[in-house]
């Protein structure tokens, strides 16, 4: 089964730059905003405009690592791109259901792919880590982080860009003994290898 992994954090904390050591042959980079990569790379970004586009990309993806960047803006596009004639509750409800379809498509894949969903925080002042989704429909009906046991936080610690990786009650979580330290450098190649080795029973 494919794995769903969230990497959440404030803008500019090193989520996208964590791809810097990956090659285009091993990663599919799906961007919601269309922003160019913040480093020199041969990785070819694939821009999507809707949750339906993401769903199709997930189903069609073959590469072992798939990154969906700025996931939270899928909700922004769904809500602010809707017609003013649409019932607002229906708009939020549809966004919630469409996002669930993406999660379902990932978890239903009979592959060893790792899907990383990068996103901003719901509330930067909150002590609980959560994906920004707009409105309450998604969080009430389909708590995104509940579908996985791997949620990382991107942050800057002592001028170093890192991922917070060990379960600590804040919403950050990972399986027992997957990581030896509270934080790791924001290098997705290293992190991905660590996850794969863990599930293969290697150290």
Residue ranges of model-derived segments:
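Conserved P-loop
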Residues: 1-61, 65-67, 72-73
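P-loop/Walker A phosphate-binding loop and immediately adjacent motor/lid segment at beta-alpha junctions
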Residues: 40-46, 54, 160-203
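Generic detector of well-ordered alpha-helical segments enriched in charged/polar residues
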Residues: 52-55, 72-75, 93, 97-100, ...
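Structured loop/turn residues at beta-strand edges in well-structured enzyme cores
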Residues: 61, 111, 146
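P-loop NTPase motor core
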Residues: 70-143
């Amino acid at each position: 089964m494919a794995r769903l992994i969230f990497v959440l954090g404030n803008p500019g904390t090193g989520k996208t730059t964590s791809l810097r050591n990956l090659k285009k042959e091993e990663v599919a980079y799906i961007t919601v905003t269309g922003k160019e990569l913040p480093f020199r790379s041969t990785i070819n970004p694939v821009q999507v405009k809707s949750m339906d586009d993401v769903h199709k990309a997930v189903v069609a993806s073959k590469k072992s690592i798939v990154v969906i960047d700025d996931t939270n803006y899928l909700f922004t596009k769904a809500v602010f791109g809707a017609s003013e004639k649409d019932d607002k509750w229906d708009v939020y409800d549809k966004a919630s259901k469409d996002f669930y379809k993406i999660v379902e498509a990932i978890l239903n894949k009979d592959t060893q792919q790792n899907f990383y969903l990068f996103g901003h925080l719901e509330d930067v002042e909150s002590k609980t880590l959560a994906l920004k989704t707009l409105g309450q429909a998604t969080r009430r009906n389909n708590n995104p982080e509940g579908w996985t046991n791997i949620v990382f936080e991107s942050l800057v610690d002592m001028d170093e860009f890192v991922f917070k990786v060990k379960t600590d009650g804040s919403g950050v979580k990972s399986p027992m003994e997957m990581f030896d330290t509270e934080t790791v450098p924001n290098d997705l190649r290293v992190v991905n290898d660590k996850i794969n080795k863990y599930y293969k029973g290697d150290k």
